[in-house]
């Protein structure tokens, strides 16, 4: 089996596992969040049941909401299966982590594609859009790593920008494919994005709020505007440097990716990182990659918290360098922790300006932004994250 065949088989197995997790959502959610609450309700005394007379109705509504969410995920899976087929050996059953990611997609779809979450999207857009309008050329090439289910791509391409998204998660990629390409009409789908969160509610009915998505028709909204595409894979692997980065779980030595990285050099006018830079186990790889992919004089716009995804992860990986002439591994580090390098915003700005030849144009801190937060007027849900916003400009004479 050659390198490409191996990569394709591995990718097919990963995609199959995600599609099956979509198909199993209803079964999983009924088991994990509904059946257990029914059992708890059955266990209490009749006297206590009389104290909460509406709880039986609540449980029935919770079950109905799970079933509706299941319809959404089945639609996503069925759409994906129109263009993907699998060999029997590629069918892999999802694990609990896969199912948890599937459940969390409801929050992501609500955040990106509902009218109710426009205030969350505007935390970035109200800052980014006016700045982009000052740039030349007006048809800038924009890269959005960690593009999620694709809403920011749509919004910016509608303004005339040529947008390329990058996404590592197959969960996100399959949902984005559906939201962008399935010809969905405005408010065609109803989801119940809050049913996996049982805390902080003022009224129990709010947890069962139905949300209509999408609030725009993405498939028709960018006609005659800028281009839009999505590249699947690790940001560092697809766009990073070919030298000076160690091989790891997110960076490979394959010939195909080497060519991709060479092509990416100095190719973008703007990189927009939105709730992204805290997602990697080595943020310096991200910073190097941003510097590599931007054209001289290019702009890096960042928005989001620094809630490092791996700060409490005790997992390990092997990292190493590869001799470009012999192909042998060198400087091998076994059991490299995934945690570590949780840099502050001051650290990041300092590295960018002092080592990567960026100039700081604008900076804000302490911006409160929700993340899939229920938007009701009396919401007691967690308020969200304290976010950082900055704009950095690469040196116009900089050569990667």
UniProtKB/Swiss-Prot annotation:
Name the UniProt record assigns to this protein: Carnosine N-methyltransferase
SUPFAM superfamilies: S-adenosyl-L-methionine-dependent methyltransferases
InterPro entries with a match to the protein in the record: CARME (IPR012901), SAM-dependent_MTases_sf (IPR029063)
EC class of the enzyme, as a word: transferase
Secretion signal, residue range per the UniProt entry: none
PANTHER family, per database record: CARNOSINE N-METHYLTRANSFERASE
Temperature dependence (free text): Optimum temperature is 30 degrees Celsius.
UniProt-reported outcome of changing residue 317 to D: In strain: SK1
Catalytic activity: carnosine + S-adenosyl-L-methionine = anserine + S-adenosyl-L-homocysteine + H(+)
Transcription in keyword set: no
Additional detail: Present with 952 molecules/cell in log phase SD medium.
């Amino acid at each position: 089996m050659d390198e490409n065949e191996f990569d394709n088989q591995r990718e097919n197995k990963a995609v199959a596992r995600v599609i099956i997790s979509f198909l199993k959502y209803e079964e999983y959610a009924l088991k994990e969040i509904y059946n257990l609450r029914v059992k708890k309700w059955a266990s209490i005394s009749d006297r206590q049941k009389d104290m909460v007379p509406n709880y039986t109705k609540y449980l029935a509504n919770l079950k109905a909401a799970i079933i509706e969410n299941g319809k959404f995920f089945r639609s996503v899976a069925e759409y994906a299966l129109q263009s993907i087929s699998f060999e029997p050996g590629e069918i892999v059953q999802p694990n609990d982590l896969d199912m948890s990611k599937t459940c969390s997609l409801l929050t992501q779809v609500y955040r990106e594609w509902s009218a109710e979450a426009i205030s969350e999207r505007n935390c970035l857009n109200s800052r980014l859009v006016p700045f982009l309008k000052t740039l030349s050329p007006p048809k800038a090439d924009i890269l959005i790593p960690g593009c999620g289910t694709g809403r920011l791509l749509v919004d910016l391409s509608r303004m005339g920008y040529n947008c390329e998204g990058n996404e590592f998660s197959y969960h996100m990629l399959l949902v984005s494919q559906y939201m962008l390409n399935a010809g969905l009409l405005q408010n065609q789908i109803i989801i119940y994005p809050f049913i996996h969160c049982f805390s902080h509610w003022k009224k129990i009915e709010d947890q069962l709020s139905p949300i209509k998505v999408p609030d725009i028709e993405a498939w028709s909204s960018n006609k005659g505007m800028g281009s839009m595409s999505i590249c699947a894979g690790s940001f560092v692997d697809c766009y990073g440097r070919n030298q000076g980065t160690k091989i790891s779980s997110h960076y490979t030595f394959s010939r195909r990716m080497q060519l991709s990285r060479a092509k990416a050099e100095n190719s973008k006018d703007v990189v927009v990182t939105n709730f992204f830079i805290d997602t990697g186990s080595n943020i310096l790889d991200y910073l190097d990659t941003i510097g590599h992919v931007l054209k001289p004089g290019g702009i890096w716009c960042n928005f989001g918290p620094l809630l490092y995804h791996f700060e409490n992860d005790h997992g390990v990986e092997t990292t190493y360098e590869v001799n470009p002439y012999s192909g042998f591994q060198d400087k091998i580090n076994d059991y490299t922790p995934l945690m570590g390098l949780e840099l502050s915003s001051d650290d990041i700005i300092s590295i960018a300006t002092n080592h990567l030849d960026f100039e700081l144009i604008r900076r804000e801190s302490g911006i409160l932004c929700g993340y899939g937060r229920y938007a009701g007027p009396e919401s007691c849900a967690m308020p969200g994250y304290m976010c950082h916003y900055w704009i950095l400009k690469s040196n116009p004479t900089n050569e990667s």
